[in-house]
Regions:
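Solvent-exposed, acidic/flexible segments
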Residues: 79-87, 106-113
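Catalytic zinc-binding patch centered on the HExxH motif and its immediate surroundings
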Residues: 39-80
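Extracellular structured ligand-interaction cores
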Residues: 70, 90, 110
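Extended amphipathic alpha-helical coiled-coil/heptad-repeat regions
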Residues: 26-33, 37-46
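Active-site or metal-binding loop neighborhoods of secreted/extracellular toxin and effector enzymes
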Residues: 1-25, 103-192
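Active-site recognition of the HExxH zinc-binding catalytic motif
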Residues: 84-97
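Substrate-binding clefts and substrate-entry loops adjacent to catalytic sites
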Residues: 69-76, 94-104
Length: 192
């Protein structure tokens, strides 16, 4: 049921969004957990996950993006659409709910979405986003733990193929040194 997540969408995306929703509702545990969390948010007063608009707009300057004010995921073309990128944009929409006014802090948001997707992929035996994360705009931001290592350097030093749960927990301990308003709600729960 597309109405569970989407308010509106470009008609050419209908079949792809149907496949995406089928996967989210019936796929791996991580995908079902995201849907369950969205349902939880919508049942509580903690925040409201607004249904997304998913549009194709050839005038976009990038292949895809999440536009917060309109709660819209834009793809430049049908060829730019992928379930993986839509999944990440849904993570951004959830971050907006969890962080409220703080969600646009660039140090945190893009890297955190990659880390969440990496962790969910790891749990399900898949590959991660390490290479994608290395190329992101804010990858040069310094970790806020008194070390001079950048996010890119940390990822390279701890390449996805070498990471295990203990490595993620170690990084999480560093992540928790970031001021409280920027901490990752979902990942901090996972480490407890």
């Amino acid at each position: 049921d597309l109405s569970r997540l989407f308010a509106s969408y470009s008609s050419v995306l209908y079949a792809r969004l149907q496949g995406f929703m089928n996967y989210m509702e019936n796929g791996d545990n991580a995908s079902r957990a995201v849907i369950s969390y969205i349902d939880y948010v919508n049942r509580t007063s903690n925040g409201v996950f607004q249904k997304l608009n998913v549009m194709i707009d050839a005038d976009q300057t990038v292949s895809m993006r999440y536009h917060s004010p309109s709660n819209t995921v834009y793809f430049k073309s049908l060829e730019d659409y992928s379930d993986r990128t839509l999944y990440e944009e849904i993570i951004h929409a959830l971050q907006r709910v969890v962080y409220s006014d703080y969600w646009e802090v660039p140090f945190n948001i893009e890297f955190e979405a990659k880390l969440i997707m990496d962790y969910m992929s790891f749990v399900n035996g898949g590959e991660g986003n390490t290479e994608m994360a290395l190329n992101m705009k804010y990858a040069k931001a310094e970790l806020k733990n008194g070390r001079s290592m950048t996010l890119s350097e940390w990822i390279k030093a701890n390449a996805y193929s070498n990471l295990d749960v203990d490595d993620y927990r170690q990084f999480l301990s560093v992540w928790k040194t970031i001021p409280a308003e920027y901490q990752n709600y979902m990942m901090s729960l996972r480490s407890q």
